């Protein structure tokens, strides 16, 4: 009886020691892994059941789990730094908003100002030789066009194109950190469980650690160890860990381990499939546009943390989602969207008119320079003709006039005014050609109520454009902001309807 009491006391002591060690392990999980930081997100992982066949808990040290956790959190933190949320690249000053690239914006102003200064200072005074009214009209027309050009240029460059406000970036960062911690706990538990199962497969820890020779006492010891293990690992709050007592035979241990591995792999595969389905479902939202059969897919923007509204796209240069995004214009240094497309269209059209005007007037001035100037070679020829007027023929007159005109043109090109005329003619021709293609392209887009990126991606290629309401109504919408409420909806609100009237 005394021996049995001593053995029972030893068994109880061992149970108490195991319970204390298991409590310490639970504290390690709570303090270092951060299991209880986000109870809402923890529910996503409560359905994962891990089956663990445990031996003697004395074989495991307290620092093993914490070391595994620290390694896994470091890996996840490195991934989080790579996916760090970038801030917007747009520049804000009171109500002025512009993009980050300002070098080409300065070049655009130089391309407009330099030819204009040469034209106003050097060439417009030549029109006085033709007519006084022509000189005054040149000053009025050129200055008026320059005012319209720079007004639309600066308004387009410093107007908010329709940037969609982001969700709170700090909250999204905290959510990502919490998710990485939960993923780290998952990896740590998997490593801890698989390492324990490998040890059990090699030998029987409980039978080797038993200090008693009687079979009855061994049975009592095994029952005590299994009950204490179940009590200590019972529903930790995030994961359900089931403890099973191994049998004495190694064959049964290996069979149980194989079955447990298969069950765990099946559960993991099912959970991965469910997570992938949830990601695919939450990546897009389909919305029907008006009464048409066209369904617009609103994509979720990871950077801005919101669902993009119809016809909205993310600009990689400014790092913003923009309403009715058309394109990012490098020459203006800003995105072209719902709020500044009208000014962009007016800018390119007025610049085209100005380039054509400079081209035509430079040709007129060059003709005037050629007619009013006479080369020294022509003066010598005229003196020779006057001295030999008796031998003068009509056939020679045509040749002499042609030679005179060529000599006068070559001589005029050597002068400052003639060289500037040639420069402005070449510059105006190139700018008129490029801007002519650009303006004609945007006229076609305006009449069909499409944007540049929609035409480039061919979104409405195989179906009718639901936003096309006729060329007259499209002109009112695009160029006069008449009833421009295509995107008057908050797609990120759960209470919004899936039917948008265009």
From Swiss-Prot:
Residues 299-349 form the DHHC domain. Keywords: Acyltransferase, Glycoprotein, Lipoprotein, Membrane, Palmitate, Transferase, Transmembrane, Transmembrane helix. Residues 10-30 have a biased composition (Basic and acidic residues). It comes from the Eukaryota. The keyword Cell inner membrane does not apply. Residues 59-73, 213-222 have a biased composition (Acidic residues). Residues 1-80, 200-281 are annotated as: Disordered. The DHHC domain is required for palmitoyltransferase activity. Belongs to the DHHC palmitoyltransferase family. This is Putative ZDHHC-type palmitoyltransferase 3. It comes from Dictyostelium discoideum (Social amoeba).
């Amino acid at each position: 009886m005394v021996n049995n009491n001593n053995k029972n006391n030893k068994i109880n002591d061992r149970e108490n020691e195991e319970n204390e060690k298991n409590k310490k392990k639970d504290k390690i999980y709570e303090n270092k892994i951060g299991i209880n930081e986000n109870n809402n997100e923890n529910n996503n992982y409560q359905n994962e059941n891990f089956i663990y066949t445990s031996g003697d808990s004395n074989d495991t040290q307290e620092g093993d789990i914490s070391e595994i956790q620290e390694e896994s959190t470091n890996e996840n933190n490195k991934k989080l730094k790579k996916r760090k949320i970038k801030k917007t690249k747009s520049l804000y000053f009171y109500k002025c908003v512009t993009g980050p690239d300002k070098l080409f914006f300065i070049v655009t102003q130089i391309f407009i100002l330099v030819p204009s200064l040469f034209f106003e200072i050097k060439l417009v005074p030549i029109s006085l030789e033709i007519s006084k009214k022509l000189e005054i009209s040149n000053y009025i027309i050129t200055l008026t066009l320059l005012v319209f050009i720079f007004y639309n240029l600066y308004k387009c460059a410093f107007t908010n194109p329709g940037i969609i406000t982001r969700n709170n970036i700090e909250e999204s960062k905290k959510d990502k950190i919490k998710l990485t911690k939960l993923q780290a706990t998952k990896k740590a538990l998997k490593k801890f469980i698989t390492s324990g199962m490998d040890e059990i497969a090699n030998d029987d820890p409980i039978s080797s650690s038993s200090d008693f020779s009687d079979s009855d006492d061994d049975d009592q010891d095994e029952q005590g160890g299994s009950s204490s293990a179940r009590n200590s690992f019972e529903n930790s709050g995030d994961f359900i860990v089931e403890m099973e007592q191994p049998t004495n035979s190694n064959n049964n241990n290996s069979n149980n381990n194989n079955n447990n591995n298969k069950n765990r792999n099946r559960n993991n595969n099912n959970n991965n499939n469910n997570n992938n389905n949830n990601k695919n479902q939450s990546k897009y939202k389909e919305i029907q546009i008006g009464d048409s059969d066209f369904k617009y897919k609103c994509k979720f923007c990871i950077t801005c943390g919101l669902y993009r509204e119809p016809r909205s796209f993310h600009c990689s240069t400014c790092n913003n989602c923009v309403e009715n995004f058309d394109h990012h214009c490098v020459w203006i240094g800003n995105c072209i969207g719902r709020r500044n497309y009208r000014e962009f269209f007016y800018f390119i059209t007025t610049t085209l008119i100005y380039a054509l005007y400079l081209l035509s007037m430079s040709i007129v001035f060059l003709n005037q320079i050629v007619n009013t100037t006479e080369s020294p070679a022509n003066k010598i020829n005229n003196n020779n003709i006057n001295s030999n007027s008796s031998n003068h023929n009509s056939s020679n007159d045509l040749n002499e006039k042609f030679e005179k005109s060529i000599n006068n043109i070559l001589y005029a090109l050597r002068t400052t005014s003639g060289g500037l005329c040639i420069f402005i003619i070449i510059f105006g021709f190139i700018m008129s050609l490029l801007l002519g293609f650009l303006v004609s392209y945007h006229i076609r887009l305006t009449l069909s109520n499409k944007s540049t990126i929609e035409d480039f991606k061919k979104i409405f290629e195989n179906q009718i454009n639901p936003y096309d309401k006729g060329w007259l109504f499209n002109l009112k919408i695009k160029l006069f902001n008449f009833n421009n409420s295509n995107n008057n909806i908050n797609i990120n609100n759960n209470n919004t309807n899936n039917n948008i009237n265009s």
